[in-house]
């Protein structure tokens, strides 16, 4: 490819990923059916400290719209009039080893209560059990519905 030729998003990301992005935009614009529509929920905006009524449209595994009324068609619609929605919480410093829980059990406790991400401090396990234990703990987080950064 000549450097003077324009590069498209498909050249960089691949056509399949570009199509996924196009589909998300179409759902957000109300031109394509969403997977899930949460109607009339109270959205907690953690930046502005506001709580307001809105609809949340999901396509696949992504939120594509939080604009009230923008998306009207969905495979599943849930009336969330009595519910709140908020971003997942992040624990910025956690010693997983001192919880005495393996990652799948830790996720079972944290995720339903809103924590979706943890930053894991490995100093104790590294000092007491060594590199192999650190590696095993990191592997144990694979496939667990709790995002972990080490």
What residue spans do the PLM features occupy?
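Short, low-complexity, polar/charged sequence segments that are solvent-exposed and flexible
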Residues: 55-64, 96-97, 107-111, 138-139
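Divalent-metal coordination cores built from histidine and acidic residues
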Residues: 2-28, 106-150
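Histidine-rich, glycine-flanked metal-binding segment
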Residues: 13-37, 42-87
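Alpha-helix N-cap/helix-start motif
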Residues: 51, 99, 127-130
């Amino acid at each position: 490819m000549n450097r003077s030729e324009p590069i498209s998003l498909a050249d960089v990301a691949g056509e399949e990923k570009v199509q996924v992005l196009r589909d998300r935009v179409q759902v957000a614009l109300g031109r394509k059916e969403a997977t899930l529509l949460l109607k009339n929920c109270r959205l907690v905006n953690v930046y502005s400290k506001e709580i307001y009524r809105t609809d949340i449209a999901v396509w696949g595994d992504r939120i594509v719209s939080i604009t009230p009324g923008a998306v009207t068609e969905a495979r599943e619609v849930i009336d969330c009039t009595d519910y709140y929605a908020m971003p997942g919480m992040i624990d910025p410093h956690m010693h997983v080893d001192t919880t005495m829980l393996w990652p799948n059990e830790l996720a079972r406790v944290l995720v339903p209560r809103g924590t979706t991400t943890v930053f894991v401090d490995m100093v104790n396990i590294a000092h007491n059990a060594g590199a192999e234990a650190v590696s095993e703990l990191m592997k144990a987080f694979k496939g667990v519905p709790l995002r972990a950064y080490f």
